[in-house]
Amino acid sequence: MILFEDIFNRAVNLFDDPDIRRAYELNPVEFSQTMRPYLINGLGMFANPTTVSSRFSDYTEAQGKLEVFDGDGGATYTLSTVPVDNSVMSFFIGKTPDPLAEYDPTTQKVTFSTNVPVGTRCSCEWYYAGEFKADFTGFSSNISPSFIASRTKDILAHCLLLGWAENEKNFMLDIRGILTDTDFKLHSPANSVRAKTEWYQNIREGLNDLTQKLSWDLWSGAIGGRQIGK
């Protein structure tokens, strides 16, 4: 099993862009909602090794809920829904993000970092992006499933970015929307990503390197260990 969020967490570092990271940190729910279709669309770029890539057709659907409260002068409010395990959460006081707010699953309570004035709305949104039901058993006995899963997360992160690169213009409009909604602005459109051609080529080469390494690891493990499957 591989959580979509684990892939998002790796992918955000590959963007190497402060504005994207700020969107990721300030509004993780909307960021994950934006990322999800690029991950799904990028799956087709994971072609080899087929013994691994063929295991990603089964994944769960996304779930989420937005809850809005009328401020009563306090900082703590109770959710009426139970967030799905491994969900990300975004908190707002009015239209201002509150990344320091906390959720206590034992009490179902959200505590904002400051008291919410009477008449001001605050909100908590949780979002579970999904997970791949991939099973990495059945390979050589000296290659652990956790090793294959880790390699695969890096591959999928690169696939996500390549899927994004095909729609860069629309994606950056989405990112601008996230930042605008939270009273933050992009410093400069030129800062959005590195020179597009070079950046795209680096990600493409990175994907090729990762898939080749995984293929080699599986082959060398099968030769060097007791093979229990293909």
Where are these regions (language model features)?
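Short, surface-exposed beta-strand/strand-loop-strand elements in extracellular ectodomains
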Residues: 172-178
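Conserved short "hinge" loops at termini or chain/domain junctions
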Residues: 1-67, 72, 76-78, 83-87, ...
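Elongated alpha-helical scaffolds
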Residues: 149-169
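Amphipathic alpha-helical interaction surfaces
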Residues: 45-48, 52, 162-170
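Glycine-rich, aromatic-bearing surface loops/beta-hairpins
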Residues: 191-202
